[in-house]
Amino acid sequence: MQCALYDAGRCRSCQWITQSVNEQLSAKTADLHRLLAGLPVEQWCAPTGGPEQRFRNKAKMVVSGSVEKPLFGMLHRDGTPVDLCGCPLYPASFAPVFSALKPFIARAGLTPYNVARKRGELKYLLLTESQFDGGMMLRFVLRSETKLTQLRAALPWLRAQLPQLKVITANIQPVHMAIMEGETEIYLTDQQALAERFNDVPLWIRPQSFFQTNPTVASRLYATARDWVGQLPVRHMWDLFCGVGGFGLHCATPQMQLTGIEIAPEAIACAKQSAAELGLTRLHFQALDSTQFATAQGETPDLVLVNPPRRGIGKPLCDYLAQMAPRFIIYSSCNAQTMAQDIRHLPNYRIQRVQLFDMFPHTAHYEVLTLLCRL
């Protein structure tokens, strides 16, 4: 992949960009083998990749410059702004949105936040696109609610220019720190969730719910989990750290009892909406801490699927799973190092199957799916 920003030394986010995709995949596979050394693996499945460029469904843009000439991108190490509108990871459909937003910011009087001076209102623009229908969600991250009236007044012009904007919000982030978003979300449209669909499974994206940024590879990840679960005798399943329910919704059958647990209420609202659309009445999603939920249960499911953040599931949950001893565990991880540490805390399980998913091309990161079977 060619990138003018990388060639000019202005952006180093894609640190592996000079390597071919095959070289990157080989290096990631070697890293995974190294991390799982000493843990016998019955089957290494072929790694799964995706597009080399234009694959991201989300842009996170720092807004800098002036209200008349805003700049979208990031701040360089030396503090100077870098325009990322031409980033080759973004789909072509993002360009007209960025183009329309620049005059809109002037119309709405949204002064870009100046980090050095601690002045201004508009900190970030967060844009997400659905692969299902091309609909988009736009979030204005503001320092305060001061400009909300002006923002609302100017919105009809923006929506006329960009009818693909289905969900628009203002997120209030008052803290002078490099924090992407605050707790307060103010909806500026009637529609509050973006419709997505992977493998004929309806999914929903809300402003403060996590969603994978590489939909092509994510859909293959979910489909693989569904295939694996379909080969197992599973009637009762837990989906821990379930997010918007991608794994559970793919794996569930009308006969299966499934409980999905996620600490973010916004994500659980998405999962419940999807389950209702599918007519799956034995699926139950709850906004709880996954470890606290699991350790409070007296029953043992046939399978526990975990998809934790980078820190992994941790020793307390590992210890409880080892004691509870479900017949199967499926571990989906964006950090194979912590996954390997967790698996070593599950001595009564063998690794039946491992598959790498290249969710983050041009970086050292990847997703991995692992099936563990009780000895």
Curated annotation (Swiss-Prot):
Active site, UniProt feature: C334
Q: Which InterPro entries match?
A: 23SrRNA_MeTrfase_RlmC, MeTrfase_TrmA_AS, MeTrfase_TrmA_CS, SAM-dependent_MTases_sf, U5_MeTrfase_fam
Catalyses which reaction?
Answer: uridine(747) in 23S rRNA + S-adenosyl-L-methionine = 5-methyluridine(747) in 23S rRNA + S-adenosyl-L-homocysteine + H(+)
GO molecular function ontology, one term from the record: rRNA (uridine-C5-)-methyltransferase activity
Q: Where does S-adenosyl-L-methionine bind?
A: Q212, F241, E262, N307
Lineage top rank: taxon: Bacteria
- Keywords annotated in UniProt: 4Fe-4S, Iron, Iron-sulfur, Metal-binding, Methyltransferase, rRNA processing, S-adenosyl-L-methionine, Transferase
Please give the biological process terms from Gene Ontology that the record holds.
Answer: rRNA base methylation
Q: Which positions does UniProt annotate for [4Fe-4S] cluster binding?
A: C3, C11, C14, C87
State which Enzyme Commission number(s) the record gives. 2.1.1.189
State the family named in the UniProt similarity comment for this chain.
Answer: Belongs to the class I-like SAM-binding methyltransferase superfamily. RNA M5U methyltransferase family. RlmC subfamily.
Q: What does this protein do?
A: Catalyzes the formation of 5-methyl-uridine at position 747 (m5U747) in 23S rRNA.
The molecule here is called 23S rRNA (uracil(747)-C(5))-methyltransferase RlmC
This chain's source organism reads Salmonella agona (strain SL483)
